């Protein structure tokens, strides 16, 4: 019985440390990061509006080019 209890407690400790290590630490949001996210959202709206009057394929090509350039130079991942 004592051996089972010891193994059970060790397993619980191991599982608790693994779940703690797997959690992402919350990042602190500052006013600057909030402003940047608002600018990105506004920038997306401007890009969508700038595709008026051109074909759907041309608009898709332009958006892809902008996203690839952003990825290459800034490494920011946009969903």
Curated annotation (Swiss-Prot):
Residues 1-21 form the signal peptide. It is found in: Secreted. Induction: Up-regulated by wounding. Residues 22-70, 76-79 form a propeptide. Sulfation is important for activity and for the binding to a putative membrane receptor. The modification Sulfotyrosine is found at residues 71, 73. InterPro entries: Phytosulfokine. Promotes plant cell differentiation, organogenesis and somatic embryogenesis as well as cell proliferation. This is Phytosulfokines 3. It comes from Arabidopsis thaliana (Mouse-ear cress). The lineage of its organism: Eukaryota, Viridiplantae, Streptophyta, Embryophyta, Tracheophyta. The gene is PSK3.
């Amino acid at each position: 019985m004592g051996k089972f209890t010891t193994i059970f407690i060790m397993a619980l400790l191991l599982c608790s440390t693994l779940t703690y290590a797997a959690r992402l630490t919350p990042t602190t949001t500052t006013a600057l990061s909030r402003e940047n996210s608002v600018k990105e959202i506004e920038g997306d709206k401007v890009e969508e509006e700038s595709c008026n009057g051109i074909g759907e394929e041309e608009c898709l090509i332009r958006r892809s080019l902008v996203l690839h350039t952003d990825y290459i130079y800034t490494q920011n991942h946009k969903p």
